[in-house]
Every structure is written in structure tokens, then in C-alpha cells.
Amino acid sequence: MIPIIVLIGRTNVGKSTLFNVLTKTRDALVANYPGITRDRQYGYCKLQSNKKIILIDTAGLDIKLNEIEKQAQAQTLIAIKEAHLILFLVNARDGLMPQEYEISKNIRKYQKKTILVINKIDGINEASKINEFYSLGFEKIQKISASHNQGINTLINRYLIPWISEKFKKKITENLYKDTELKKIAIKVAFIGRPNVGKSTLINGILKEERMITSNTPGTTLDSISTPIKYNYENYTLIDTAGASKKKKKINDFQRFSIIKTLQTIEKSNVILLIIDASLQTCHQDLSLADFIIHSGKGIVVVVNKCDLFNSVELKKIKELIKSKLKFLYFSKIHFISALYKKGIFQLFKSIKESYEDSKRKISTSTLIKTMHIAIKKHQPPIIKGRRIKLKYAHLGSSNPPKIIIHGNQVKYLSLPYKRYLINFFYKTLKIKGTPIQIQFKDNENPYVKNKN
């Protein structure tokens, strides 16, 4: 069993900053806006002697709440139940706040081991401001500045490592090794789309639990949330992302950062589910996202959600329209589903696995050369300045995505339509599905024949 530690506290006390410091990532959003973290954010923290813990960042616990914030607090209470240890963060600059008495009462209800972490001590000279936190009645207290990395080593060495050694007396190295191996081979699947297209609802349907906050309010998910699952003996990591909304003249820092993280999530994922709202059909934003995914070289599966809103005649027209607009994604499967009613959602895994396997497929040089020659025989390259462009050799430069390198004479003069013809021919002949192919042309060089000079 891997120890689970949860970070709780009011909004803007530095939970996400400490999460990022301990996990050595930027997986949690950090900015000087209260209430940015809404869902549970999971991360790994590696300690000394190969010890490893799961760290959970949570939404701030405050008094005045709107509906979404109430749901976020419910997520925090679930995280407390999951935890073996609680790091209760407070803000030294604000001093002791009334909410913190309520939070400490809630913690005691669950009878969880707790360390009070007094954050943002940098620049604080008033000892009285810090000392008043002792009235909360916690035995173990550590003063830190997460943003300045002050007191972090003491927190780890004085409290976290001894607690793990005491609580988990059995060696956890074997479990950690297994967990790391599972993490390595898990297929990372990112759920990408405009706000409110049903990304979180789809993940909840797959997980069969309310792990993501779902609401009709656009922008409910502000961060990229990763959840590991196993389906048909295959390991997956499902990544929910903030919706990539249309560009606005005014967009604050943390919304912009969420969009950036969505694009970063695409980069670090294996397969992307591009989710489209059937009731809104496709727009420029969907096409832009699709274009970005293609250029990233990631596998792509198109998911058209909310099909339950239409009758069969209407749905047929919508299918034809969407397929027409996305014809440049001819190599990708398009699924028409209802995440809310869980219709067609588990068929997605077949396409996800197919896309992933094809992206890593090793294609022999002989197969590529043979395919290229068949393509040339059916449609020869154009003639430039009285000489026909010659394509001589082809080999696989890399996989994930498949990158085919073609050598020949005057290849720099190949037209875009002919390049597209070759790409389409390779797709159809090699039966590659769900992943983009990249072709690179090199002039007059055979990589397998050395010069005899």
C-alpha cells in the first residue's frame, strides 16, 4: 500500500504551491486567485530510501460558497476519507481565521493523523501572528515558506519519513516498483474539447463515480486531472482538462494557464479524445484543436457527445455534417455517444488501443519501399524542368507517430497534392488507424549504401 497524504486548508494558503514543490511538477494550478483548485489533484512525491507517497491537492475550505464551490468541498471531504495523513495548511500572513477552527473540528471527526503546516512565514516578524495557530491544538507543527522552499526538508525529514516508517512497517519498495511499472505502461488518454462538452461526465461514466465535478457552467474544470484505471487487462490514465474556450479579449492569468496546460497535456498524452458537442456541432475552435493534435503527432479519436438530444433523423444529418467538416481526420474513428446515459462509451477503448498500437508500430524498410513503388506506379511524381522527380528509398525514421523518410532526386519540388497522395496511400495500404503519419523528404541520399570514395 502506498501512503496517501492530503493537503487541506482555506483558499489561497499555498496548498497547490506545496503540492508542486513536493511532487516537483507544476501539475496543480498556482496563482494569487482564491479557489483555483476545484477537483482532487493527485501526484507522486518521492522521498528518501525509495519511499514514495501519493499526494492529494484539494479545493479550499471556506464559508461563503456558490454551488460549484460546495461540490468542490465535497471532493475535499472525500479526499480526507482517502488519506492516511493530513497536512493542514494555514497562512501566517493572514493570521488565524475563524474558518480554521471549523476545519480543525472536521479533521478531528475523521480521527486522521494531522500535521499543522504554517505557510508563508517569509517576511513575517510578528511572532504573535504565528503563535496564535497553536490554539488549534495540534501537537505536530511545521513552519514553512513553500514558494521559497524554506522548511520543506525539515517537514520531510522530521515528519513525513518517520511517519511512513512508523505507519507502514512493511517494506513498500515492491509495491512502489509495481506501481512505477504500471505507470510506465499505462496508455495516457487526454479528454480535450470546448468547455461544457461533457468531458468530466464521460470520465465519470467510465469510472462509475463522481470523481470530477460536473456542472452546466462552462469552465468547471480548471486543471488537468489524471485518474488511473484498468479496463480489459490494460492500464490507462484518463486526463480531464479545462475546456479550451474561444479566445476572449479579457482572460485572466489562471484561465490562460489552464489553456496552456491543456495544450501541454496533449503533448504528454498518447491518445487524444477530441470531444464535440452534437448540439453545437463543429466550430472553428474544434477544427483548431484537431489541427493542433495532428501537428503534435498524437493518436486521435473523435467523440461526438450528447447524441441523446436528437431523434434518428436529426442525428443522421448531424453525423453527415460532422463527418464532412472533419474529413481531414479520415484516419480517425468517430464515435457518436451519450456520456450522460453511458451509451457507446466503452466502445471507445477499442479505438484508443488501436490508435496507441498503430502509433508505436514498427514498419519494416522493405514494406515501406514496396508500398512507395506501388504508389509511384499508380501515380508518378511530376516532371520538373524536363526531368521527372525520382523517389528511391523509404525507411521508418521514428515511431509515435510513424515518421517515414523518403529519399530521392529533386524531392524539394514535390507539390503539396502529391505529398498528400503519398500520405493517403500509406494510410490505406498499411491500414494505419487513429494516428497521423509524418513524411519527410531527403534529396539524393541512400542511408543504407555508404559512399565508396
Swiss-Prot record:
Chain positions recorded as GTP 1 binding sites: 9-16, 57-61, 119-122
Domain EngA-type G: 3-167, 187-360
Gene3D superfamilies in the record: 3.30.300.20, P-loop containing nucleotide triphosphate hydrolases
Signal peptide: none
Keywords assigned: GTP-binding, Nucleotide-binding, Repeat, Ribosome biogenesis
Residue ranges of domain KH-like in the record: 361-445
GO molecular function, one term: ribosome binding
Sequence positions that bind GTP 2: 193-200, 240-244, 305-308
UniProt cross-references to PROSITE patterns, sorted A to Z: G_ENGA
GO biological process, one term: ribosome biogenesis
Coiled coil: none
Function comment: GTPase that plays an essential role in the late steps of ribosome biogenesis.
SUBUNIT field: Associates with the 50S ribosomal subunit.
Family: Belongs to the TRAFAC class TrmE-Era-EngA-EngB-Septin-like GTPase superfamily. EngA (Der) GTPase family.
Protein name: GTPase Der
